[in-house]
């Protein structure tokens, strides 16, 4: 026999899948009322708030998740996404660094740091973190493509012809690697 808490929780998951977010929120709040330390309920509730762009509620709910269990790198990563939507980049960077301190090979966290630096037009720092993505996942063709794009931006702003040539060389190698990896992924999906 399934208990009340689980019934609400599984109903919430079904409602999330069907994009019936208001009902999912109601069900998740009921789960939390029955068990105020249910990390999965808080996590899913925060995700729903994020998906419906209710960022302040998402932030509050992620804060509660961290209070319950401060050792989950995903929660810090997800809270960083909320901070980015709120243009609170410093807070997002702190959360991403925390996520990485918990999980050193969290390539998505390195990638999101590169996104923040790109938004701030700190292109060399962005490239630095894309290279960290590739250290943890050398098959990430999107990271190679982003490196290509960022070096092309640097080329436009660089006066030194030697550096321009170096940047162009790196950009072209990155584009080629991205294309090759993307092609391989596409072929493997067709099989």
Put a short name on every predicted segment.
Residues 4-34, 40, 47, 51:
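Alpha-helical segment of the N-proximal tetratricopeptide repeat
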Residues 5-6, 39-40, 73-74, 107-108, ...:
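Helix-start (N-cap) detector for alpha-helical repeat units in TPR-like alpha-solenoids
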Residues 17-18, 51-52, 85-86, 119, ...:
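Register position in tetratricopeptide repeats
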Residues 30-31, 64-65, 98-99, 132-133, ...:
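Canonical positions in the second alpha-helix
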């Amino acid at each position: 026999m399934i208990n009340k808490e689980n019934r609400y929780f599984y109903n919430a998951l079904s409602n999330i899948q069907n994009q019936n977010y208001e009902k999912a929120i109601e069900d998740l709040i009921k789960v939390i009322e029955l068990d105020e330390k249910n990390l999965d309920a808080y996590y899913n509730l925060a995700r729903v708030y994020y998906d419906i762009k209710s960022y302040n509620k998402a932030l509050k709910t992620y804060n509660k998740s961290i209070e319950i269990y401060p050792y989950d790198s995903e929660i810090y990563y997800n809270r960083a996404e909320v901070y980015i939507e709120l243009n609170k980049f410093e807070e997002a960077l702190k959360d991403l660094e925390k996520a990485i301190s918990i999980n050193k090979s969290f390539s998505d966290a390195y990638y999101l740091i590169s996104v923040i630096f790109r938004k701030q037009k700190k292109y060399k720092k962005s490239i630095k973190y894309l290279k960290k993505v590739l250290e943890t996942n050398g098959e990430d063709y999107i990271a190679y493509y982003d490196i290509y794009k960022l070096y092309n931006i640097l080329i436009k702003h660089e006066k030194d012809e030697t550096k321009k040539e170096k940047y162009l060389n790196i950009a072209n190698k990155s584009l080629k690697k991205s294309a090759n990896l993307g092609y391989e992924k596409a072929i493997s999906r067709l099989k």
